[in-house]
Amino acid sequence: MSCVLTGVVPLGLVLLLCGAQGFFLPNVTQLEKLLSKYQGDQPHSRTRRAISRADREEILTLHNKLRGQVSPPASNMEYMTWDEELEKSAVAWARECIWEHGPTSLLVSIGQNLAVHWGRPRSPGSHVQSWYDEVKDYTYPYPHECNPWCPERCSGPMCTHYTQIVWATTNRIGCAVNTCPRMNVWGDVWENAVYLVCNYFPKGNWIGEAPYKTGQPCSECPGKYRGGCKNNLCYQETYGQETETDDMNEVEAAPIPDEKHVWVTPRVIKPKKPKKDSPVNYMTQVVKCDTKMKDKCKGSTCNRYQCPAGCLHSGAKIFGTLFYESASSICRAAIHYGILDDRGGLVDVTRNGKVPFFVKSERNGVQSLSKYKASSSFTVSKVKVQDLDCYTTVAQLCPYEKPGTHCPRVRCPAHCKDEPSYWAPVFGSNIYADTSSICKTAVHAGVIRNESGGYVDVMPVDKKKTYVASLRNGVQSESLRTPRDGKAFRIFAVRQ
């Protein structure tokens, strides 16, 4: 083996905003395989943590201390808390003993800092401090320099460890330490290398953005903090309620409290009328062979239609070729264009502006007519059907573009509700941010059942200024205010 001097190597991560849509998250099988590494053989077995309580406290305390003393001061820096799920994902990667960021499938959702050393013992806090010390090479980009994107001001080899630590909206962290018997570090094999992995959520290091807003500390905290401020950090009082009390850092079942009996007079409850089921919204409209585009398209959901069988020999008229006049039969136009046959099926419609004239032609057994008068037009396209995992977003699948975007009809697997929000987030209610998991959103909206999954239709729309959180069907969505990028979507049930 090569002789390597005792040393420390950090590794930082930059996530490209423009490239995030290119990532696809793991399917259920891969995720279960990853999470199975955290689970013992017995559901209540005692297992020692991959990081000691002292190291955990040191890492978390130092992060919050450093975040509270940035210069220039931050107006929106959030207090950071420890997250068990992030710790588990860090444990899984640390045990791989691979000197690179990973796993790739998770990097779309999390930020990550890495460090490794061998020889003389070092505390995890010393690595955190070395990450932060990159500040000496970093110049903060003030608002007037961002037009709209902020310049990258790093005069050293790397500043991304520092920027991830002080990324204002990153408010959760989970780390793990693992001793690797043999670890390849840039071509050299280190024996008994101590590997530190820290995962962060929400991720930071977005290219073109400043890590935080500058100003009076806590003057621009998100509304959920309700004015709370501690050591220059946006703070919620609930943070102080520590639940873990085991100083040995072992996980075991909590003791059952002593049983107490409270005698009360039972209250008489009047029977309530059964609640009416909420109306189910469908994007796909069921039409007849003679249904005209101008008669049916009178709302936002007029871009997908279910045509019946037997329209080939219907007497319904169509006008034009490729571009069809709005008085044309939707289903006959789809057969003329070659999207459907006489068996019927799904067709997507795109509304267009006025066309000066429409030319007749005969295609696929359907004769269209001419009309030499300017009129509104539409085009037709085939509806694809695609299977998804629990993590795919509209931003990845079919982001909104003007004048409109058609998404495939998608089939969601079962049990997406159980996926953690780091990998399958949901932002909003009724109208959702397009960075939300499609299938978990479908459960939240009530268009599919979590136990069975199923087909859904999605409609990309332009972005909203705010997305409001809500708890529906066992799924807690998150709020999102004034998003700089990204669009939105609506989600609909499919008739079975």
Swiss-Prot record:
Main location per the UniProt record: secreted
GO biological process, one term: face morphogenesis
Disulphides: 289-307, 311-331, 390-412, 416-439
MF terms in GO: glycosaminoglycan binding
InterPro entries reported for this sequence: Allrgn_V5/Tpx1_CS (IPR018244), CAP_dom (IPR014044), CAP_sf (IPR035940), CRISP-LCCL_domain (IPR051957), CRISP-related (IPR001283), LCCL (IPR004043), LCCL_sf (IPR036609)
Domain of life: Eukaryota
Entry's localization field: Secreted
CC per GO annotation: extracellular space
UniProt keyword terms in alphabetical order: Disulfide bond, Glycoprotein, Repeat, Secreted, Signal
Residues of the SCP domain: 60-200
Tagged with keyword Isomerase: no
Domain LCCL span(s) in chain numbering: 283-378, 384-487
Pfam families noted in UniProt: CAP, LCCL
RNA-binding as UniProt keyword: no
Signal peptide limits: 1-22
Job description of the protein: Promotes matrix assembly.
The protein's assembly and partners: Binds to heparin, dermatan sulfate and chondroitin sulfate.
Protein name: Cysteine-rich secretory protein LCCL domain-containing 2
Organism from which the protein derives: Bos taurus
Higher taxonomy: Eukaryota, Metazoa, Chordata, Craniata, Vertebrata
Protein's gene: CRISPLD2
